């Protein structure tokens, strides 16, 4: 990958000049000038996904200049480097190959001169066999009863992705009840297991090192809870499996290493749902649906690696995001799925984006002079319309939004879906085109109001519009289409990191807090006041000690 400061490129300087002509351009004028703008600024992927980016503050010239930035910063070379197994995560000396996990074409991918695909396929076979046994009832608990409930214990990438996917694909779930525990707050594990039967519960402990503090704390509490009923530690092996590479620690915990599912250091946590970390997905939906999820992602991988940049959906979305964040100063993006099953999608890509591109030094270790990752947030529609859309429509901060919806609902109750989608379509129209003072006054006049009655309230009913959105319309949310959608966002994030000259696949920012927590934990064991920190931290710890009894 090229280490290029994007702000020093000719393309960046050209974009700055172009921005001066675009900063006040109205989306409404762009549509007036080109009534068929939709056909020029939208694309369909595999007849499953329509991506409409026409309601953005861009022209054909904007895209040409943004694409020049991608070319100058070596995006094509960066894509090739990732897919070929090059160690592009240089701070950890690792390849980045979540794409290998869903490489349904089974083409060789080499890391250190070794094809990784035989190992990937072997783990998939092992996962399938395990799923078939548990789902089919062949796997029995220590009393001889079949498994009814599965608890995935993990945190970060070992939790967010599997939880998001099993929720998004809930219509495909089988008879197994899936639960997720992540927080080290004891409430999470306590509330999850309090109504479960130890004899019919299977725990999946997801930790590559088998040392993650939150995960192992919860795993030991789950083990203690299980043994209160089961008694014999030999029974642990019938009720616990591991998603890990630390065979020694897994065995010491009491798990049969035959039920340890490995993954590799070239799998980043927030890109790991495609690996053994996705075992809970496969157990919940069936392995055939897990394979369809992989196939959808692989199809998007193929699009990303083989499509020219000017037609490449992840690249186009990435460039539009950089345009807003770095030239307009729009620092956040909202992800707004109009599908209740997708209620964890924004949270998943909050981690996916912010942990990947929330960096302030470039690949050469220098502080950057430009914006890197945006703040990502969002909630499902229409709930969000009744909470934060007020700010999106009329606030002083412009928030570019991604609206996501399926054309076909899994729950076609009366006219629910038509009402949901009418809101989906209306919101992007309202954000783009707004409502003028003149239109407000005409409405009041038609309602029989006098000019005096209108005068004081009209300013509050004006919508400036010109608020940018992307609309992503799926035919239906299926394992295949969801896989493609997730990969679309993954590759958008990668493209932005490549252009912004940062390391997208490390996360050193999570380390300092963990180090300090490990230092503070022993200080909490005693009741005596401490004075080893700043006055604020000392004060908080000492008040906690005085209040905890």
Swiss-Prot record:
Highest taxon of the lineage: Bacteria
Major localization listed first in the record, in broad terms: cytoplasm
Biological process annotations from GO: gluconeogenesis; glucose 6-phosphate metabolic process; glycolytic process
Pathway involvement of the protein, from the record: Carbohydrate biosynthesis; gluconeogenesis; Carbohydrate degradation; glycolysis; D-glyceraldehyde 3-phosphate and glycerone phosphate from D-glucose: step 2/4
Localization per record: Cytoplasm
Matches recorded under Gene3D superfamilies: 1.10.1390.10, Glucose-6-phosphate isomerase like protein, domain 1
CC terms in the record's Gene Ontology section: cytosol
Class of enzymatic activity (EC top level): isomerase
Cytoplasm is among the record's keywords: yes
Alphabetical list of InterPro entries matching this protein: G6P_Isomerase, G6P_Isomerase_C, Phosphoglucose_isomerase_CS, SIS_dom_sf, SIS_PGI_1, SIS_PGI_2
Enzyme Commission number, as recorded: 5.3.1.9
Keywords annotated in UniProt: Cytoplasm, Gluconeogenesis, Glycolysis, Isomerase
Catalyzed reactions: alpha-D-glucose 6-phosphate = beta-D-fructose 6-phosphate
GO molecular function: carbohydrate derivative binding; glucose-6-phosphate isomerase activity; monosaccharide binding
Any single Pfam family the record assigns to this protein: PGI
Keyword Chaperone: no
Catalytic machinery residues: 355 (proton donor), 386, 514
Family recorded in the similarity comment: Belongs to the GPI family.
Function description: Catalyzes the reversible isomerization of glucose-6-phosphate to fructose-6-phosphate.
UniProt name for this protein: Glucose-6-phosphate isomerase
């Amino acid at each position: 990958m090229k280490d290029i400061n994007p702000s020093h490129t000719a393309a960046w300087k050209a974009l700055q000049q172009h921005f001066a002509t675009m900063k006040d351009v109205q989306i409404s004028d762009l549509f007036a000038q080109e009534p068929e703008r939709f056909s020029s600024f939208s694309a369909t992927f595999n007849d499953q996904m329509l991506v409409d980016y026409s309601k953005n503050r861009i022209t054909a010239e904007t895209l040409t200049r943004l694409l020049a930035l991608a070319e100058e910063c070596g995006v094509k070379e960066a894509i090739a480097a990732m897919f070929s197994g090059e160690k592009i995560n240089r701070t950890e000396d690792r390849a980045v190959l979540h794409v290998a996990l869903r490489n349904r074409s089974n083409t060789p991918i080499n890391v250190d001169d070794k094809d990784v695909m035989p190992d990937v396929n072997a783990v998939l076979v092992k996962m399938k066999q395990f799923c078939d046994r548990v789902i089919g009832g062949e796997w029995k608990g220590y009393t001889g009863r079949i498994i009814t409930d599965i608890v995935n214990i993990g945190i970060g990438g070992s939790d967010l992705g599997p939880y998001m996917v099993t929720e998004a694909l809930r219509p495909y779930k089988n008879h197994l009840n899936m639960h997720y525990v992540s927080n080290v707050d004891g409430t999470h594990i306590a509330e999850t297991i309090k109504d479960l039967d130890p004899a019919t519960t299977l725990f999946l402990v997801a930790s590559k090192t088998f040392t993650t503090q939150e995960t192992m704390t919860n795993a030991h509490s789950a083990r203690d809870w299980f043994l209160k009923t089961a008694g014999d530690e030999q029974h642990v092996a019938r009720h616990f499996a591991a998603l890990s590479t630390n065979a020694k620690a897994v065995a010491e915990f009491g798990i049969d290493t035959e039920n340890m599912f490995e993954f590799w250091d070239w799998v980043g946590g927030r890109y790991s749902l495609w690996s053994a970390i996705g075992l809970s997905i496969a157990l919940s939906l069936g392995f055939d649906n897990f394979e369809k999820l992989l196939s959808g992602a692989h199809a998007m991988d193929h699009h990303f690696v083989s499509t020219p940049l000017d037609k490449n959906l992840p690249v186009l979305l990435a460039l539009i995001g950089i345009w807003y964040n770095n030239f307009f100063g729009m620092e956040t993006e909202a992800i707004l799925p109009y599908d209740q099953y997708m209620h964890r999608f924004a949270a998943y890509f909050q981690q996916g984006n912010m942990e990947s591109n929330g960096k302030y030094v470039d690949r050469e270790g220098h502080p950057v002079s430009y914006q890197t990752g945006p703040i990502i947030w969002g909630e499902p529609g229409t709930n969000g319309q009744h909470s934060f859309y007020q700010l999106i429509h009329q606030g002083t901060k412009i928030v570019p939004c991604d609206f996501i919806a399926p054309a076909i609902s899994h729950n076609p109750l009366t006219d629910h879906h038509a009402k949901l989608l009418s809101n989906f379509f209306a919101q992007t129209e309202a954000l783009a085109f707004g409502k003028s003072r003149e239109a407000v006054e005409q409405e009041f006049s038609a309602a029989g109001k006098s000019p005096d009655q209108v005068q004081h309230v009209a300013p509050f009913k004006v919508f400036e519009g010109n608020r940018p959105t992307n609309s992503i319309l799926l035919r239906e949310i299926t394992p295949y289409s969801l896989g493609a959608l997730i990969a679309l966002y993954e590759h958008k994030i990668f493209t932005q990191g490549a252009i912004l000259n940062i390391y997208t696949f490390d996360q050193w920012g999570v380390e300092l807090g963990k180090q300090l927590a490990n230092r503070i934990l022993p200080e909490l064991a005693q009741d005596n006041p401490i004075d080893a920190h700043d006055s604020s931290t000392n004060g908080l710890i000492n008040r906690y000690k005085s209040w905890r009894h």
